[in-house]
Amino acid sequence: MEYKQTLNMNKSGFPMRGGLPMREPDMLKHWQELDLYNELLKKNEGKPLFALHDGPPFSNGALHMGHALNKCLKDFMVRSAAMRGYYTPYIPGWDNHGMPIESAIIKQNKLNHKAMPIPEFRSACHDFAQHYIDVQMEGFKRLGVVADWEHPYKTMAPSFEAEEVKVFGAMYKKGYIYKGLKPVYWCYHDETALAEAEIEYQDDPCTTVYVKFPLHDDQGKLTDEEKKNLSFVIWTTTIWTLPGNLAIALNPVESYVIVRNHQNGEQYLVAEALMEKVMKVGGVEDYTVVSRHEGAFFENMLADHPFLPKTSRLVLADYVTMDSGTGCVHTAPGFGADDYQTCRRYGMDMVVPVNDQGRHTDYAGKYAGMLVEESNPVILKDMQEAGSLFASEQIVHSYPHCWRCKKPIIFRATPQWFCSVDSFKDDACAACDDVRWLPAWGIDRMKAMIRERADWCISRQRRWGLPIPVFYCKDCGKPICTDETIAKISKLFGEFGSNIWFEKEADELVPEGFTCPYCGGKHFEKETDTLDGWFDSGSTHFASMQKDQGFWPATVYLEGLDQYRGGFQSSLLTAVGALGKGAPFKECVTHGWTVDGEGKAMHKSLGNGVDPADVFKKYGADICRLWAGSADYHVDVRCSDAIFKQLSQNYLKFRNTAKYCLDNLTDFDPNHLTAPADMEALDRWAITKLNELLVRCEAAYKDYEFLTVSHAVNDFCVVTLSSLYLDIIKDRLYCDGKDSASRRSAQSALWMILDAMTKVFAPILAFTCDEIWLQMPHRAEDDPRNVVLNQMTKPYADYALSEAEMTAWETAFRLRSDVNGVLETARADKRIGKSLEAHVALFAKDEDTKAALEAVKAIDLPEIFIVSNVSTDEAAPAEGAVVEAGVSYPGLTVAVSEAKGTKCPRCWMHSETPDEHGLCPRCAAVCKALNVVFE
């Protein structure tokens, strides 16, 4: 007799292998036809708002793994919030203006951009940016990101530019924006100012020099002995800045010494705290201290410049430290922020002896026309020959480089537009207190950056950017930015785009009949600089979020760590400065960088990059999503083919668990779940464990701890289900009567588990969970179209076991672990084959073990151990039994012998009361109900 056909061995249409690269595009098509994003909004309309504001990626290249990580995390946020009952508008955006696009256009098309009409060049930049918006959008869609792809915001869009102009106008009106000559980061390769967020530091070798500035005028303060052959010794790592030296700064309260070099009769002024180090570097071994004075004593003395016909003034500054150098600080106001402020305090004129191209001007004398890096060895040689060089060293130091061209930059004073952050620093820091920061240290980092930052340089000497909406009166020369001009420019930009600024003359752009508010003049010219791209991204909360989406502030911003000095900060500053409000976000979350499998930065030159498109083709987008969802994203996230292979194995465990459930639910109607009172205790144990999973995952989603969700689901599948519960209930599912209460109890638990597990993992494993959802039987209240259109399952409180009952079950499973160990020994000794061939006898040697056996008396131990018989009251182990002590319970003795009775040909359980066909009572009853005909 073939009994297989009498078993409940059903098969669903859910394949064991995912085939994700082939299957996912069809699912994307289904989502598109469903209009999933808008359906999600309709589902939760009128419910509490969860607004994730998309910090815009830059539209200058294809998708990379950093993009993938960022967008996966955002999609997890949106999907999980929607499934927790929130209304979740999500408008994707792109940052379009800036030097990287200009550079790419020039290189790609070999353009002479300086000879091109500006509107024509800007149009080429626009097309380039739009191309990569399209490329990136397709990549994000392939990743499964649910968003309003039909209506993204773009910082180059006329509507956006019109609103950004208003942000500038509001800050100008409050007096926060001004034009001044101040040192800024300057890339002379690209001929533009840079923001702090556009700077990358690299270790560069350099020659550091100690230079003698001979005394010129001591203001009658020094004795003849002190001033004889006296020089002030300065130290610098930037030789090329020496032509710009105007002063030497000393700390007013530190002790300075005049040191006599007995080897050559020279005398040097250095800080006493640094004297030994300086003398050692200079090779001066025989020296004495002539005198000591506080730094303030030397104020306003004059020194001769070492190679130019001019003098340098001795000034005082609190920032002069005794950590390095000589205590006498080379001060060139055109090349340093502190230098600039100090010289300004002393009423000195600004000197900037380097032009936009990084070449020395005529002010530098014989070095005029040289690039700064070319002049270093020449100046060094000249100082050596003139006897001005006290010492030199070769060191490696961290030096700023341009984020785009990767070349060293300089600090250089140029006329720029600035935002006076000092005016509202306190308000910006106070706004941070109302934000939830994840990680928690984010608030300290942000506040420190705001407090320490200089005024924000918001102008760029570039063409592809939003024009700074300022006019200049040709008669009085004053800059003009009024409510009237801002309103007119905003209207023009909104209608025609910002190219109109370069297509029309100033007189055509100002309001009709407009006159200079200072002198009444009627003729104007336009500002030629454009706005910093960070001003663009810092305006998105107003230009997109508030205007187009109708809410403010956002629930959350999520971006990379670099955005503390980038988008997070610029958004905070514009919100406080322009709008007079608090932070534009209630929560601020950061993620780390994506790095290779060894933790190294990914670069094309190193060949260690991972292309998301390759991941999609080889593994599928869900594996990429699982990578993002399994990572501690607050630190750097490793990425490699080996990692994706391992994740694919983890994925298969989840998929196989789902397949097991689906295969055993093909004949189940979840509208008729087994009631709690009627459900088998083992099934209620599984539901209680499910409840624990749901509580843990709900808390994790609230804190955006997706790693916790992924690990919890994986552990639940592997530990609770696959290796325990699912293994135990196979007999009930396959062999009990199809409609029996015991089987329906197991099916009810299976459905509850699969339903909840699919929903709780759906924000992360979007494609696979939806595939499962489409295969599942559903209740009447479910939305069968897509899993994300349903709410997360709440814990099944009515089905939960008590704490005492759960303790008893945990005891049973600890006993099971000990029994399994002995079963393995018996199997290895060939005493038994399958575990169903075993009879297990348990013996307690101590009170704790006796109590454990007493606690599990109500539990069906043969079912739990998957054996035919279990006894706890035998006097001694059977003859020939395999006997071992327990591990979980050292006081336990486990004896395994051959099962008593006859092996049932249908379920393979051994029975001492078989029928005439050898069937156990359970299988005999099932076959009778099925009207099985025995031949």
Predicted feature locations:
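Acidic, turn-prone loop/beta-hairpin segments
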Residues: D95, V184, Y188, L194-E200, ...
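Protease-associated
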Residues: A247, E254-C328, A337, Q341
